[in-house]
Regions:
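N-terminal non-catalytic cap/leader segment that marks the start of a structured domain
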Residues: 1-107, 111, 285, 307-309, ...
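A generic local secondary-structure boundary/capping motif
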Residues: 66-69, 101-104, 128-137, 142-143, ...
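Residue-level "contact hotspot" at macromolecular interaction interfaces
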Residues: 70, 136-138, 252, 279-280
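Non-heme Fe(II) oxygenase catalytic core, chiefly the N-lobe of the double-stranded beta-helix
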Residues: 83, 116-177
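Catalytic-pocket segment enriched in acidic/His residues
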Residues: 87, 173-334, 339
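Short catalytic-site patches enriched in acidic/histidine residues
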Residues: 94, 112-131, 151-152, 196-205, ...
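Structural signature of FAD isoalloxazine-binding scaffolds in flavoprotein oxidoreductases
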Residues: 95-122, 139, 280-292
Length: 342
């Protein structure tokens, strides 16, 4: 991008403008003069015929480059739990599930949000790793909103004014929970924060090219050739604007921050679609697509056992559960059990 800008400045005698060195810098400068320059660069490349014949070194086929995560280590990732009606009580009997959905429609409450580790982010084509001994790994496709302007106490109707664009995200989840003993609540760090649990990309589409997510969103996830999830925004409990409004009431949002909109029904822990729980296994391939943005593609592999002499680590699920996908084994009195997934 910097090379293309320098070439245009020389050939077109355009005013000099510094190009930021990373995506967060691009996002922060986008509405402060950079957007017009990027448009001009693209138009110049197209109109000069640089896409055909002999190309300058800064014009390449997408297949000739490796597509990294757009923001390899975001400052902050906030995800929204259970924000699609079809994801409510997915593993409950039909009557109980219908009741839970009706109750939520009658009282939506406020979004339920959690932080995801920035170190979990990987780009399309990178491998999702099942941690050693963890046999209940799940998939969730989400629309991720990228903040473009600082936001604090913004209203839902004005929230999209603070958005830079949108990308695809997978919220990979370890549903195995904590072993018995100690703290008894849901361990969100175990479930959501481990390495490779935050695939993101392949691109960020600026909001002016994507449109209103509440009318545009269509997302689909496949494991192999089997479609596991498909949804649009009509299934969402809180809109993208409402989620940003709530998030900005808790913390100051800055350019490059990522906000996941939540996932729909069809995740592995749910029984309402397939009648049984199904988990990711080594050799699986995930294809996650949001229309108008792009597709994430990831293979799944199992991590080896930790090396001898390793200190404390999360034990294999088989040491405190009766087997893959089985109900929790009985725990000693007063000990912790398995937390519910989100």
């Amino acid at each position: 991008l910097a090379a293309a800008n320098a070439a245009m400045e020389t050939a077109r005698k355009a005013p000099r403008l510094a190009i930021p060195s990373d995506m967060v810098g691009v996002i922060a400068a986008y509405e402060n003069g950079l957007k017009g320059r990027l448009y001009a660069i693209v138009n110049d490349v197209v109109q000069s015929g640089a896409l055909g014949g002999t190309r300058p070194p800064y014009v390449r086929e997408l297949t000739q480059v490796r597509t990294l995560a757009p923001i390899p280590r975001p400052r902050m990732i906030m995800n929204t739990a259970v924000n699609f009606y079809s994801h409510i009580a997915e593993n409950a009997p039909a009557e109980q599930r219908a009741k839970a959905i009706a109750e939520r429609k009658a009282n939506r409450g406020v979004p339920y949000m959690f932080l995801k580790a920035p170190s979990s982010v990987i780009g399309t084509g990178e491998t999702i790793v099942i941690p050693y001994g963890r046999t209940e790994l799940d998939w969730e496709i989400e629309l991720a909103t990228i903040i473009g302007r600082p936001a604090r106490y913004v209203s839902a109707p004005r929230a999209l004014d603070h958005v830079f664009g949108y990308t695809v995200m997978l919220d990979i989840s370890d549903r195995g929970g904590r072993p018995p003993g100690g703290f008894t609540g849901v361990d969100w760090f175990v479930m959501k924060g481990q390495d490779t649990f935050g695939p993101m990309g392949p691109f960020i589409v600026p909001k002016e090219f994507y449109g209103d997510p509440m009318s545009r969103l269509k997302q689909t996830l496949l494991v192999g050739s089997d479609q596991r999830q498909q949804a649009d925004a009509s299934d969402m409990i809180h809109s993208v604007g409402e989620v940003i409004e709530y998030a900005s009431s808790l913390v100051t949002l800055l350019p490059g921050d990522v906000i996941g909109a939540g996932t729909s029904g069809g995740v592995g822990m749910g029984t309402s679609v397939r009648g049984e729980q199904v988990w990711l296994v080594a050799g699986d391939e995930i294809t996650a697509t949001i229309d108008g943005i792009g597709t994430l593609r990831h293979k799944v592999a199992a991590a080896p056992a930790p090396p001898p002499g390793t200190g404390s680590y999360l034990p294999p699920l088989s040491t405190y559960r009766r087997g893959r996908g089985a109900a929790p084994a009985a725990a000693p009195a007063g000990s912790g059990g398995r937390g519910r997934g989100q």
